[in-house]
Amino acid sequence: MLQLRLLPTFSMGCHLLAVVALLFSHVDLISAETEMEGEGNETGECTGSYYCKKGVILPIWEPQDPSFGDKIARATVYFVAMVYMFLGVSIIADRFMSSIEVITSQEKEITIKKPNGETTKTTVRIWNETVSNLTLMALGSSAPEILLSVIEVCGHNFTAGDLGPSTIVGSAAFNMFIIIALCVYVVPDGETRKIKHLRVFFVTAAWSIFAYTWLYIILSVISPGVVEVWEGLLTFFFFPICVVFAWVADRRLLFYKYVYKRYRAGKQRGMIIEHEGDRPSSKTEIEMDGKVVNSHVDNFLDGALVLEVDERDQDDEEARREMARILKELKQKHPEKEIEQLIELANYQVLSQQQKSRAFYRIQATRLMTGAGNILKRHAADQARKAVSMHEVNTEVAENDPVSKIFFEQGTYQCLENCGTVALTIIRRGGDLTNTVFVDFRTEDGTANAGSDYEFTEGTVVFKPGETQKEIRVGIIDDDIFEEDENFLVHLSNVKVSSEASEDGILEANHVSALACLGSPSTATVTIFDDDHAGIFTFEEPVTHVSESIGIMEVKVLRTSGARGNVIVPYKTIEGTARGGGEDFEDTCGELEFQNDEIVKTISVKVIDDEEYEKNKTFFLEIGEPRLVEMSEKKALLLNELGGFTITGKYLYGQPVFRKVHAREHPIPSTVITIAEEYDDKQPLTSKEEEERRIAEMGRPILGEHTKLEVIIEESYEFKSTVDKLIKKTNLALVVGTNSWREQFIEAITVSAGEDDDDDECGEEKLPSCFDYVMHFLTVFWKVLFAFVPPTEYWNGWACFIVSILMIGILTAFIGDLASHFGCTIGLKDSVTAVVFVALGTSVPDTFASKVAATQDQYADASIGNVTGSNAVNVFLGIGVAWSIAAIYHAANGEQFKVSPGTLAFSVTLFTIFAFINVGVLLYRRRPEIGGELGGPRTAKLLTSCLFVLLWLLYIFFSSLEAYCHIKGF
């Protein structure tokens, strides 16, 4: 932050030193002209004048010939007022740029037709980025200079002035030399920034130099000293021509007409952008407003549009993976933080990394200067607070339900046939707990029948004041018959509330719903498991889905149709697309031992969470053939742990039944288990043995329908939801825009912390610095005043746009009068005042914005690429509009619009020469030794920055010498 604040201050110091040197070099002229009368002003155009003219708004400060002390006082007042007006213009320009960001971020929905006939919908930006940069963005950045030129001409009876044109040229020089010098220097040593859209830079740079060359041509070559109507209009019409050329260069419509262009979703803004490639054989058509768009029908999105859906999906996936990576890194770096804090950190980091417009950097710079804080951090914190608030509101609503709800604790209950009774729990939640609530219950047959499988039960449950839970019991009838699992239902009905208002103490039915009602579930299903069979073992379902963040997943193995005896069921995991060994899950195998009457066991498998945005991997969990275990086998297994024994047994009708355990006197190191098969299949069975076999076959444990469970590992829902929320919040128009006047007034009176060096800790609350407080109190008047400007939510930003530009025009009129009166008070010509002071005041926000863009952006386009385009727009709009109006006015009156070519033509020529040097140096820096227009080795940075600062000082020096006739101009 220290560097951010000192470097622009250093450039301001250069300005002031230049002015001081200029004043001292002309002290003899100023002293000689101290006694000059007003009428002598025309006798010497080469000297400054103490005779002030009436401004567009401000009157003359009488008397015209004050004492030396009064001059110092007046100059101080004018200077302070001018600086304060510059602060006001910066703040209203902030609102203006916010509206432009919202306007240029407008989207339109389109329908994408895939080759297979499927259609999906997506959005595209309406405004082309290059067009918006050269039109609305440039207008927002240069509105004070443009309006100053127009207001000066219109406010002085359509006569040419020096303040407006000189401000435009001076601002162009400051932008081209000082701002670029600063951007070159602030990039960290060893890092570089290159211009990404070089062809657009070439076009705008060429038009920028041409604009000032054109000024010289119409002032000194075509019609010296006179601006004709066609010259003014042509100057203005060069503006749309420049925009079209830049757009053509950006879209390659001339030289790249036959190069196939594909469109994909941009990672940063969620928009569809274009790149080149080979034309595929299949096309994807796009519909907008019901019309199919292709290269033969329409010229949508600046050219032939064939959208590669698969590639767009890949880019979306890449963006989501990047979001997921950021969240994982933050979670590892800050394990102690809650999810809301991690969302805030991730949101801020995502917003910081994405590509931003010139408007955003201008807004960010202004708010940092005026104590309004870092808008990215404020936005991230607001989003996190909103998420917490919504959670708290939902929780509070659920807990404060005014109606008592009566329902079963769970919708399903299970019991064994020999359990005697089954207990069902009824819950009372919400409402007034001081009331007494009555609810009826009644059993109903399902596959189980009352009287043979369970006891029919009905009654009324009474919840006394303060009671929230009651229990009812239903009798279960046991038998010795093998049968399938059966179920019956228990219903709740007829909720009543006790009240003293009625004679019987019970509310009428039509009054009950306001105090109590049935909740969900109001019906419970009771399943009776048969206990006369060893059981059928199965999973609940063939497929299950689990989140990768589950940690330990538990899978139930059910024992149905009986629960008699102890049974061992082996299980194991099998790899599918998911890999074991700790990559996607940990390999698991073992045995489940079901005790007598035990009907469910769980298998635990550890799932590895690698926090992928999208995941769909499978593995399998399989159970093996169950086997019945008698007590003798359990003893054998226990002795096995002690060591040394031999098991002898026999197969009974195909099933291993263990009978005896013979322990050795002296245990041996290795356990040896010998199972002797005593049953011979060839031996005929007696009738008794046949009956025993039939009964054993009927009662043995078997596998059920689902013996192999497919486990599908999916991404974490919470993790994916968080990433999706971050994806949706990357539109910067939501960050800089406002939704209500209330929001604007709160923001206006709130002082926030500015930039800091520890960006990673943005989740921690930062206190405003002394600088933040000072700047806030200096600018709070402007903040509150401009809070009356309509929010950017209205009319899609156009209401804010119109009101803001009117406010800028009013303040610019004041600035023009103050600058002119300040100059005449100290004896400076308007051309010098404009080049130095006014150009400085209007360029300080751009200086901060370019510095931030140079350090944060991956490319140099946002920091210096727009400087050249802005310079061209200043001439074509600022001078073109003003001179066109004046030329038409004078032509209508049969007069000529006269403009003195001297100072302006000289400044324009000087600037053009230096601009060629500037552009040449920037292009040379793209060589591999340096690597880019900005940054590079420290020595190269210093030399480049010093050269550009020297060019600006020479421009100021020679322009001032020519203005005071020390050197001859044109």
Swiss-Prot record:
Gene Ontology CC: nucleoplasm; plasma membrane; postsynapse; sarcolemma
Residue ranges of the region described as Putative calmodulin-binding region: 251-270
Keyword Ion transport attached: yes
Membrane topology: Multi-pass membrane protein
Binding, Ca(2+) 2: 417, 478-479, 531-532
Binding site for Ca(2+) 3: 417, 479, 481, 483, 530, 532
Binding-site residues for Ca(2+) 5, renumbered to this chain: 548, 610, 612, 715
Stretches assigned to the Calx-beta domain: 393-493, 524-624
Sites where a glycan is attached: 41, 157
Activity regulation, short description: Activated by micromolar levels of Ca(2+). In the absence of regulatory Ca(2+), channels open rapidly, and then inactivate rapidly. Inactivation is enhanced by Na(+) and is inhibited by micromolar levels of Ca(2+).
Name listed for the protein in its UniProt record: Sodium/calcium exchanger 1
Assigned protein family: Belongs to the Ca(2+):cation antiporter (CaCA) (TC 2.A.19) family. SLC8 subfamily.
Extracellular side: 33-71, 155-167, 223-228, 819-821, 893-903, 963-970
Modified residues (Phosphoserine): 282, 389
Keyword Hydrolase: no
Residues annotated for Ca(2+) 1 binding in this entry: 417, 453, 479, 483
